[in-house]
Amino acid sequence: MEWGPGKTAQGRARLPSSRPREKPQLSCNLCGDAAHQPRVTTQDRIRHLESLVFDLMQQSSVTQGQHGGGTPFSPVGSARFPVNTAVATTGTDSGSMRSTGGGANYVVSSHWAAVLDGIAELKDHLDSEDEAVHSDVHGVESPTAEITGPQLLYGCPKPASKDEILASILSLSRPVVDRLVSRYFNSFEMSPAVLHSVEFLKEYEEFWDDPSSVSPLWLGLLFTIMCLATQFEKFRLDPGVQSPAALSMERDLQKMADAYKLRIGQCLVLGNYTKGGPYVLETLMLYIAAEVFSSTDAEIDIWILTGNTVQIALHMGYHRDPKHFKGMSSFAAEMRRRVWATLIEMDLGLSAQMGLPRMIKQWQTDTQEPSNLQDSDFDKATVEMPPSRPETELTPILYRLVKARLMTTVGYIWDFAADVRPYTYTEVERMDSKLDEARKSIPDCLKWHSFARCITDSPQIIMQKVVLETLVYRAKIILHRKFMLGPPENSADSKRIVLESALKLLDYQHMLQEESQPFCQLYQERWRVSSLVNHDFLLATSILCYYLQNTKREGMPVSESTPMDETIMVSLRRSYDIWLQSSDSSKEARKVVKALNVVLGVSNTSGTDSGLDSSMSSSVPSGCASSTINDYQSGVEIPAGLGSQFPVLDGAMMPNWATFADDLLAAPMATPSNEWQAMDAAETVDTMGSLAWPWNLQCHALAEKVNDESLD
């Protein structure tokens, strides 16, 4: 059957409506049955309409590119490339909009949710579920609905005086708070970018000498440290131990963290934080980090709070380099540079997670990058800053410095993705070259080689290396996705780069799953994974699903599938089990499981197994790292080894799943495989036994007290 402009659904030429009928029709003869006319389904009509819209958008975009449409300003260099005027355009260039029970959700076209929306075969599943969910909640407002996300956005439930806040801290013994502060500085890799450890400890001693002398905002900063440290302890609990003592411990730690977050909001309000001032940005940034750790999925509230933080930073002049301001100390200037670099990273990461344009543009700021210095190299008494240490020396701040440098290029790429104007393949080549240069500039002490070469590294360093690598792969996908199915002269390279990058990201996901198992190298650091991290893997999964479904739509017989297609199928099958294990606690994981059910043809009728048929299961090796990607020569310099990713606020750059239905399809969901759970069940060791909690009763009492106050 041939469809197209001027054709009927059966492929015949359409007669003009003005054609006169030569004689009246006085009778009709019964026609015989059409010879095996194919049935035109609703799905066929959807595809036909999509193809027409796609053709029209291509024509419109090319016209704009030729007549003043222009391409986005690219301030990342002037390398000479042969001019290629092919314009990046796909059927989802305008992004994706979905109505929800509470309004509408929009994401840019490079967001994983928009990618899945572009798969016609998923439309019926996703849309029908949307309608079912929304019809249940339409016009119904729960009187007992809890506020989720940062309470600071909605006002504190009960304002508190400084004396009340002080009393809640002083009710704890100092050793209790000391342990929490120690846990924070020894666990959180973002701490040197926000707080100067030497100066903070001086202020900490002054607080215990005279508690009433500190400001409410400094108290808020202390509570953010205590909150994050408590979350870190909770995340370290063994999920395989479900004894009453373990469950009680988890509940107590969650109550403590919630109590501390309530106090943070009270301190910020009491300190009139919107006016700015000392400790405001540091407290807000750590508060945002605590909220990110509390959420299993992307939350719009956190992004909005980040926007407020950016506005306060602009109001305080952080976007301008301190050299413009006379009288500012060397110490203050260096710390402002550290805070601003970290805020840029948070803005980009959370904006990309939500699938929305970032708030800080590079052309709006001239703040220089911070120096590679230990905290012991300078303090408030420093008059002239020492020279930056060489980047062969791995200081606590070096990772943030290197990542901020890489994020400059990644930020421009995200601006491309969020720009409403089309861009040319020449711009893609230029940006891709800049990205490769930025990757090559990563110091060797933070450069990923292979997991085997990381056996002497700390888990934190391993994850830092992998994060920098995955940042590049994410950016490659975002940059080349629009040309993936574009003009033949450009699509081959872009398709290869996108597929190899997506496969590599899923290899990292698989390694993450393996190395975070008991007795493996990253087991004690598995808590570092956040909702931001999973968006890298969501994008990789959705882009591979999109590719496979488009291959099917092109009519390629199964017997003609390429080795790359087989590699993709194996990788997606392994990821399916990982997503399935997370689906109980994550709506985003449930959504991608539904998509994979359709793409992989997974039976969803059984509630006793993972849903993979025997042929699929047999093709996935159990308990070993995926090596299929290494069988291919990569155009993006894929390293030989694999690794896993557990960044803290390191998901910078990948889109969100927020536009899908909360629950996809009414069919019962398959349960995860028993292998991982059985291994945990066989282990009877209570890992909490080695954790002495002499301070638990005091912290629990504080949590109960604060919760009672909030209900008064």
Swiss-Prot record:
Query: Which Gene Ontology cellular component annotation is one that this UniProt entry carries?
Result: nucleus
| Deleted gene: phenotype | Resulted in the down-regulation of the three biosynthetic genes from the trisetin cluster and a reduced accumulation of trichosetin, and blocks the expression of the cluster-specific MFS transporter MFS-T.
Q: Where is this region: Disordered?
A: 1-26
CDD domains per UniProt: fungal_TF_MHR (cd12148)
Q: Does the keyword Metal-binding apply?
A: yes
Stretches for region Fungal transcription factor: 302-379
User: PANTHER family recorded for this chain?
Assistant: UNCHARACTERIZED TRANSCRIPTIONAL REGULATORY PROTEIN (PTHR31001), ZN(II)2CYS6 TRANSCRIPTION FACTOR (EUROFUNG) (PTHR31001:SF74)
**Known function:** Transcription factor that regulates the expression of the gene cluster that mediates the biosynthesis of trichosetin, a trans-fused decalin-containing tetramic acid with antimicrobial activity. Plays a specific role in the induction of the cluster-specific MFS transporter MFS-T and thus regulates the detoxification of the toxic trichosetin in Gibberella fujikuroi cells.
Designated name of the protein: Trichosetin biosynthesis cluster transcription factor TF23
